[in-house]
A protein has these predicted regions:
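Extreme N-terminal leader/anchor segments
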Residues: 1-37
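Aromatic-lined, polymer-binding surfaces characteristic
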Residues: 47-212
Length: 212
């Protein structure tokens, strides 16, 4: 992986940007006002609901933040998160579905605001996400594999395109194609029969198509 070759992320990096105003953060059933300097407490918070914890790990909360300090807040929370969970590969933080979501959300953030942290370190960190997905693909046989495998493919495909890693994109694309045949019926409906998941998974495929 060459951290100097990232064709679609731009060159801006946030490095030492620090927030000066409070953050209102919303995490799947959990909301809190975070004061500048309290990011470590947020990252180490013991959540009652696992979905709130997963939302933190996935960085899916950042698009819903408002205010001029959003980028600075993501910068310091990212730094705190990496120090706390970057090497803790056995917990929820590195579950493959969550890894794919975090990779995609951080890439989206970088395209809007710049890379959190220092460029080479952050890109190297992002490159570790591919191996975490590859080594834990969520395939559990024809009858026990849900839609998570398609999301694994989405993470590899979009991450590969944005980071210039062709192998990721190739494998991710193949997973998406094969899973599309398996999880959708011939008339385009998700076999699970859930309208919620149908919209979610359809959005995944549309996102990959538009990015390609």
């Amino acid at each position: 992986f060459n951290a100097d070759a990232f064709p679609r992320l731009g060159s801006r990096e946030l490095r030492d940007a620090r927030p000066t105003a409070p953050l209102e953060i919303h995490l799947a059933g959990f909301s809190q006002t975070v004061l500048p300097g309290d990011e470590d407490n947020l990252v180490s918070h013991i959540f009652q609901d696992t979905e709130s914890l997963l939302a933190l790990h996935r960085f899916c909360w950042w698009p819903h933040c408002v205010g001029e300090d959003t980028a600075s807040w993501v910068n310091v929370i990212f730094d705190s998160w990496v120090r706390r969970f970057g090497d803790d590969r056995d917990g929820w933080a590195w579950h493959p579905y969550t890894v794919a979501e975090r990779l995609i959300n951080l890439i989206k953030f970088a395209k809007v605001h710049g890379l959190p942290g220092e460029k080479v370190e952050t890109l190297t960190f992002l490159s570790h996400h591919g191996a975490a997905i590859f080594s834990h693909l969520e395939y559990f046989g024809e009858n026990n594999t849900g839609n998570h495998l398609a999301n694994n493919g989405r993470g590899l495909f979009l991450g590969g395109l944005e980071l210039g890693l062709d192998q990721w994109a190739d494998v991710g694309g193949r997973i998406l194609i094969e899973e599309g045949r398996r999880i959708f019926t011939s008339n385009g409906l998700l076999r699970e029969g859930s309208s919620h998941y149908h919209l979610l998974v359809t959005r995944w495929y549309a996102e990959c198509w538009l990015t390609a």
